[in-house]
Amino acid sequence: MDLIKQIKEQRPNLKDNSINAYLIALKKLNNNKEIEDLDFLANKEKIKEKLDDLKLTTRRNYITAVLVVLRAFDANEKLIDYYKNIINDLNEEYTGIMSKNNKSEKQEANWIELSELNKVFNSIEKEVKAMDLKNRIKLKPTDFNKLQDYVIAGLYTLLPPIRLDFAPMFVESKKSKINDSDNYLFNGGRNKKVFIINEYKNNKSHGQQTLRIPSKLNSIINLWLKYNDTGNFLLNNRREMLSANGLGKAITRIFKPTGKNITINLLRSIYISENVDMKALKKSEELAKDMMHSPAVQKGIYYKDD
């Protein structure tokens, strides 16, 4: 498969270093194997797993490479549209990052570092461990609530923080009972859990999303499910399914020891600010201004592989 020849025929003005950067990105998405065909790009879940661990700028570069090669080979339009939706969302995220980086007075007043949020999680963890829960059959309400706080704190410090999509959420162990309109913790076994997200902001363009659960969070959830057998992942004070609004309030309450008013949006902004190369993004904005085109056009022209 002559990728370079095909890309040059489709994009004759594309520089060699750009093409080389695209080929490097594609090879990485193909498990560092030489590319014999483009079938691996149809495995959306595998590609998503590889992208999830990358920085925003790198994700954009890789998806740009995917789109360039798919278009060069006149690939399936639905597959091209799928990756176009991803790049559009990444561009939207970029715009959000740039706007949020200029903090409002309210954000500035409540801004903290991720390390402060982690301190709250560690403090709750110490309290839970002191309860010796593994040797107890039932919990009193205060201990039960503290355990759920531990779960919620883990959801938003041990994972890149998504929105309030963990509530409402069902716990399900049979895939046949999972529909395409609700959110689930799929419990396939002690070490076989994933979050299945159907209802979220961009569900119309991206469809069902599957979130892997890291080992530490998996252990916390195992402990939680030992005492929570309701079939609902998170609960309100009446032991009924927690709402998204209730989860938002719980997050603010749980992180109150920081002395700040931590909302889900602020929490996400803090995470982004510490995990995205703002200097590189600002440089892109400045370059766009110097070249008299918009950042959106800048993103569509060329993404340098980092």
Predicted feature residues:
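Active-site/catalytic core of tyrosine-dependent DNA strand-transfer enzymes
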Residues: 210-267, 271, 276
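Short, basic interhelical loop/turn and adjoining N-cap
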Residues: 14, 293-299
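Non-catalytic DNA-binding core/recognition domains of DNA-processing enzymes
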Residues: 4-90, 265-269
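C-terminal catalytic core of tyrosine-transesterase DNA break-rejoin enzymes
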Residues: 266-294
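Flexible interdomain linker/hinge and immediately adjacent N-terminus
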Residues: 79-135
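Conserved tyrosine-mediated DNA breakage-rejoining catalytic core shared by Y-recombinases
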Residues: 168-215
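Basic, Lys/Arg- and aromatic-enriched nucleic-acid-binding interface segment
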Residues: 118-164
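A short, glycine-centered helix-capping/turn motif at helix boundaries
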Residues: 146-149, 155-178, 278-282, 291-292
